Regions:
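Single conserved hydrophobic/aromatic residue that forms the stacking wall/gate
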Residues: 1-13
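Hydrophobic core segments of alpha-helical transmembrane domains in multi-pass membrane transport
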Residues: 6-7, 24-36, 69-74, 107-118, ...
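Hydrophobic alpha-helical segments of integral membrane proteins
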Residues: 10, 14-21, 42-57, 71, ...
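Membrane-interfacial loop-to-helix junctions in multi-pass transporters
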Residues: 17-24, 54-66, 96-100, 196-203
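Short helix-coil transition sites and intra-membrane helix breaks within transmembrane domains
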Residues: 37-43, 74-83, 103, 140-143
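Hydrophobic alpha-helical transmembrane segments of multi-pass integral membrane proteins
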Residues: 62-98, 102
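Transmembrane alpha-helical segments and their short flanking loops
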Residues: 87-95, 131, 139, 143-145, ...
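Membrane-embedded helical hairpins/re-entrant loop segments and their flanking transmembrane helices
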Residues: 104, 111-143, 153-158
Length: 225
């Protein structure tokens, strides 16, 4: 019996070392090698190309780009399209192109904010669980955590995605139109003190959030109880 207990403890120790140390370490090494060998070179070339393109973009073309980046942030809620838009915004920060980061941040905040507001305005369109999560969803939106919209999108992907993309694209457009700028890659409303034209950014958020909420109210039908 004691021998069995000792073997079980040894197996537990080995398993804990394997899962707590070896697997994370090997995963980190793999990702590091992958970044250095496969991802960084093309990303560096993309960075150089993007810098050249941004230098030549003025007026209407920047409005289009801001709209596109805002909409991309709401396309897959933290997936590859979302991350591509986010990387574009962070790369623009290197050249002090703060307006695009503002469009990206506004676009990423709109889905949770719009869904949270829709839960409050149109409670019959959502389940009791979704309504209870509305405050948390609003908080995630305020802090630029786009993934807060994911549970709602999984339940009703078409309607939620259409509403979120429309609101986010509109918010991205307005941030460029009003000359907003964001000098940091993350933070949401906590970055308002360091933003360029904070009132304009709040206007973009308000319009985008309301657009998404109203579209959800129109697209989603009341649930049958």
């Amino acid at each position: 019996l004691h021998l069995c207990d000792r073997r079980q403890r040894q197996m537990c120790i080995r398993d804990s070392i394997k899962t707590g140390l070896l697997v994370p370490l090997l995963s980190l090494l793999f990702v590091g090698v992958l970044m250095v060998m496969a991802i960084n070179p093309p990303l560096g070339r993309f960075n150089a190309w993007l810098s050249i393109q941004l230098d030549g973009m003025q007026g209407g073309s920047r409005l289009v780009l801001g709209t596109l980046l805002g909409g991309m942030m709401a396309t897959d809620y933290g997936g590859p399209i979302n991350k591509a838009a986010y990387v574009s915004g962070t790369l623009a920060l290197v050249d002090q192109q703060y307006d695009l980061m503002a469009a990206v941040m506004a676009g990423g905040m709109i889905p949770p904010l719009g869904i949270g507001l829709a839960c409050l305005l149109f409670p019959t369109r959502f389940t009791s669980t979704e309504r209870c999560s509305a405050p948390q969803t609003l908080l995630m939106g305020a802090t630029f955590v786009t993934e807060g919209a994911l549970p709602f999108a999984l339940r009703d992907p078409l309607r939620v995605s259409l509403a979120c993309i429309a609101g986010s694209a509109l918010a991205g457009f307005i941030t460029i139109l009003l000359g907003c700028g964001c000098p940091a890659p993350h933070g949401g409303l906590f970055l308002l003190p360091v933003m360029e034209n904070p009132p304009g950014f709040l206007i973009a958020l308000a319009v985008g959030t309301l657009t998404t909420a109203l579209l959800l109210g129109m697209l989603k039908k009341p649930l049958k109880h």
